[in-house]
């Protein structure tokens, strides 16, 4: 990827950005991130897939099939499509007799929607859920909203770059966050790279 993009500090979402001049890593532009999903080596679509130890990404069917959740051993559900329109109507009450912890976010699968407002809370829920695994993160199709939140979790909690997170997840599930979500994940990647650079320079000054 880095050999095909131009190094830039521009805020242009279509430009690549190199945050750390001593690193070979470059945050790709949004269009380059989209291209990562269009190769033929990714996973085929399924209702639910394990994308990280004890972390599952699934669709509406998976979230609604209570017997299937028991078989999977799901203990926590993150509904990335809470609400009434083009969303999954479950809620905490749907799982009251299953000893499942529920967390819902009202996210629209639109490029203009600010899903980054849920990156921190979703990451915290997934992280805490893994002390009592397993967690299902879902939306309607399990491809855009839920995928964006899991990608953010891998970046924020496990230190993956946006490129590494995408490559990891797409090998295990057929996902495709919308263009706006990718733009926000790209911005998160730059922010995390800047944080790490500040930490590195701070340690060098000690």
UniProtKB/Swiss-Prot annotation:
Source domain of life: Eukaryota
Catalytic activity: O-phospho-L-tyrosyl-[protein] + H2O = L-tyrosyl-[protein] + phosphate; O-phospho-L-seryl-[protein] + H2O = L-seryl-[protein] + phosphate; O-phospho-L-threonyl-[protein] + H2O = L-threonyl-[protein] + phosphate
Active site positions, chain numbering: 139
GO MF, any single term: protein serine/threonine phosphatase activity
Enzyme nomenclature, EC number: 3.1.3.16, 3.1.3.48
Sites where the protein binds substrate: 138-145
Subcellular location: Cytoplasm; Nucleus
Domain Tyrosine-protein phosphatase: 47-194
A Pfam entry, by short name: DSPc
Gene Ontology CC annotation, any one: cytoplasm
UniProtKB keywords: Cytoplasm, Hydrolase, Nucleus, Protein phosphatase
Main localization (coarse): cytoplasm
BP GO terms, sorted: negative regulation of MAPK cascade; protein dephosphorylation
Entry function: Dual specificity phosphatase able to dephosphorylate phosphotyrosine, phosphoserine and phosphothreonine residues within the same substrate, with a preference for phosphotyrosine as a substrate. Involved in the modulation of AMPK and MAPK1/2 signaling pathways.
Family stated for the protein in its record: Belongs to the protein-tyrosine phosphatase family. Non-receptor class dual specificity subfamily.
Name this protein carries in UniProt: Dual specificity phosphatase 29
Species in which this protein is naturally found: Gasterosteus aculeatus (Three-spined stickleback)
């Amino acid at each position: 990827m880095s050999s095909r993009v131009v190094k830039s500090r521009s805020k242009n979402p279509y430009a690549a950005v190199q945050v750390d001049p001593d690193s070979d890593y470059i945050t790709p532009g949004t269009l380059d991130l989209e291209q990562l999903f269009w190769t033929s080596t990714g996973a085929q679509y399924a209702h639910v897939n394990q994308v990280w130890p004890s972390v599952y990404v699934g669709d509406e069917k998976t979230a609604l099939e209570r017997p299937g959740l028991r078989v999977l051993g799901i203990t926590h559900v993150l509904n990335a499509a809470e609400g009434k329109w083009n969303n999954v109507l479950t809620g905490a009450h749907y799982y009251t007799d299953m000893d499942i912890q529920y967390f819902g976010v009202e996210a629209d699968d639109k490029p203009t929607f600010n899903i980054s407002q849920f990156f921190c809370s979703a990451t915290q829920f997934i992280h805490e859920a893994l002390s009592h695994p397993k967690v299902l993160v879902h939306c309607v199709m399990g491809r855009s909203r839920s995928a964006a939140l899991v990608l953010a979790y891998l970046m924020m909690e496990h230190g993956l770059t946006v490129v590494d997170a995408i490559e990891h997840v797409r090998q295990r599930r057929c996902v495709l966050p919308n263009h706006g979500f990718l733009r926000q994940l790209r911005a998160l990647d730059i922010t995390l790279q800047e944080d790490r650079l500040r930490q590195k320079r701070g340690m060098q000054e000690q």
